[in-house]
Amino acid sequence: MPESATGVALNTIEVRFTGGMLALNRLLMTLQNKRMPVAGFTLGSDNDGMRATILLDCPPESALRYTALILALEDVSEAGPAEPIEMALIETSKDWREPAERSGIETHEDGGTVVASGEPQKVEAFLAALGDGVEDAVRLGPVARPEVRGGA
């Protein structure tokens, strides 16, 4: 997880927008021109448009003000706080099932690679519990927790 430069907790916001690359450019220019304290940025797309997960390194009150500015952009359909999730792909020689259960994270194995996901602090605790048993790890996050839309 990126470290906070200001000593306050990082605030995660999720922004949904349509309009392709021009809309993305407007969002990025807004982040830059308003000097928003961006600590992390993840972009994804689906059938409904694009989704950006932004980590802001500022107090919660400032994050809400920045969210209001972003929500005012013409291409933005939604913007608001999001619960972060971290993912890790791990190769380990240790048994990972018990530490995963104790840490309270979701895990499964796919082709010899352990896929772990959960709250950033819990993923960190899981990796610490594995200790030197981790042969290789790739970490992604924190990102916004996936949201189920329209049932299913």
Indicate where each model-derived feature is located.
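Long, contiguous binding/interaction regions
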Residues: M1-L10, G19-M50, L55, P60-A152
